[in-house]
Amino acid sequence: MDFPIPQKTGPQKIALEARGLSCIRDDRVLFKGLDFTLKNNQVLLLEGKNGCGKTSLLRIICGFREQDAGELLWCNTAIKGSNYYAEMAYVGHLDGVKKELSVLENLKMSLALSQAGKYTIDQALDKVQLAGYDDSLVQSLSAGQKRRLSLARLLITKKTLWVLDEPFTSIDKQGIKLIESLMHEHISNGGMIILTSHHDLVLHEADVQKINLSACH
């Protein structure tokens, strides 16, 4: 599937900037002196062998751990002094859904904590091919369906930056095409995406930055 070059729309002059980021784990330097700037309509793909620090960098970007050196800026302001976390959504390996709740209850809970996005709950469920699963308990869903539910959470909330850790895990070919379509739609509307993936992205090359963390020691 080939996507057209995104028409640049949506919010402008928003940027996430890393300056000299370093991360140390168990006395081992995962990466150091890392710089990047991500703007509207762009994707940042993190590459590298297992254990090179891809997930650790995502955790720093999401505020789950502190960097050992350097700084992260959102619109030229340190992220802790900005509205950064209100603008960021994270989907990790565990999907981040409550297994004891229904599909609908999970989405209502997400919506209560965030500003509403362009999709209603019904529209989002239809978009990710979970229409009719409103009352289904999450614990009864397959791994792929749980991943689709996580994607629905992105659609119903208004977030500029999506941070995705291996989003194509547990997804079939149809689901891969769905995720690629949603990513293209998001950056076309002024969004930004940071992700790790072993899957070849089907997006316009000019909109994708790549960082190989294996080379950042």
What function would you assign to each model-found segment?
Residues 137-143:
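Conserved ABC ATPase signature
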Residues 67-86:
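Conserved ABC transporter NBD signature motif
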Residues 62:
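Helix-to-loop junction immediately C-terminal to a conserved catalytic motif
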